[in-house]
């Protein structure tokens, strides 16, 4: 098969997803990386979907109140809920980035575990992981503040019209903390932050190990005597590739 950017596509196979290969203990922290990466990506996806649902509902609420208000008032009403819209967008963006950075590392580790990467790539990967972790943390803090202490409000109409609009369009509620979906969004996002931080830490530890001993299996990189077939090999110090 073709080789793209140095990756031999013939090495990709469905068998790589099997338990025996995925959790092969010969590779340093391979099992742990797969577990925490998947937790960060999957729980992040759940947080992203919940935030997207909330964003969609509050955006529709804004339009519905504006359009319906002309039937109960001479002036159109405006719903002010930009805070939760901004919090949802921030959550969505950083959860997508979590899936991008750790998803890429997941598949590289899955299909090409012995590949050695240039230093600039390792540095960029670690730097992006730190930035994304910080971004998820910021998204979690902002979302917590908005959902637990803020609420949307209506302007442009009298109090009677406001009450009627709220009665007609009661869901999602103007008080963000009164909606279970928003609470679920917060819980999932904080769990995502913890898993993302753990993924970043274990990525740093694995990168340091690979820089010192190379990405070869422990039976090769530590014993450094012969392969599983009994063929002698010599390892270049720190490179992680047989010569």
Regions found by a protein language model. Name each.
Residues 1-37, 46, 50-74, 111-115, ...:
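Intrinsically disordered terminal tails
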Residues 11, 30-47, 51, 85-149, ...:
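Signature of small four-pass
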Residues 21-29, 72-91, 168-184:
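Juxtamembrane membrane-interface segments at transmembrane-helix boundaries in membrane proteins
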Residues 59-60, 94-95, 152:
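Short low-complexity stretches enriched in small and charged residues
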Residues 60, 107, 160-165, 199:
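Short, highly charged low-complexity linear segments
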Residues 144-171:
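Juxtamembrane non-transmembrane "cap" segments at the membrane-aqueous interface
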């Amino acid at each position: 098969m073709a080789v793209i950017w140095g990756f031999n596509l013939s090495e990709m196979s469905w068998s790589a997803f099997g338990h025996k290969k995925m959790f092969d203990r010969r590779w340093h922290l391979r099992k742990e990386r797969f577990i925490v990466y998947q937790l960060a990506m999957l729980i992040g996806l759940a947080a992203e979907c919940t935030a997207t649902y909330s964003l969609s509902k509050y955006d529709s609420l804004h339009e519905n109140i504006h359009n319906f208000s002309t039937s109960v008032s001479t002036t159109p009403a405006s719903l002010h809920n930009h805070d939760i819209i901004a919090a949802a967008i921030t959550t969505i963006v950083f959860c997508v980035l979590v899936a991008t950075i750790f998803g890429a590392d997941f598949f590289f580790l899955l299909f090409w575990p012995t590949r050695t990467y240039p230093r600039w790539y390792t540095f960029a990967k670690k730097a992006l992981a730190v930035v994304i972790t910080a971004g998820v943390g910021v998204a979690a803090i902002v979302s917590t503040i908005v959902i637990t202490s803020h609420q949307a409000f209506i302007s442009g109409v009298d109090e009677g019209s406001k009450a009627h609009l709220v009665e007609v369009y009661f869901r999602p509620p103007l008080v963000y903390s009164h909606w279970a979906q928003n609470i679920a969004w917060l819980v999932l996002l904080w769990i995502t932050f913890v898993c993302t931080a753990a993924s970043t830490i274990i990525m740093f530890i694995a990168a340091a190990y690979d820089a010192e001993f190379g990405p070869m299996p422990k039976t090769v990189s530590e014993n450094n005597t012969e392969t599983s077939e009994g063929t002698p090999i010599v390892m270049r110090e720190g490179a992680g590739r047989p010569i």
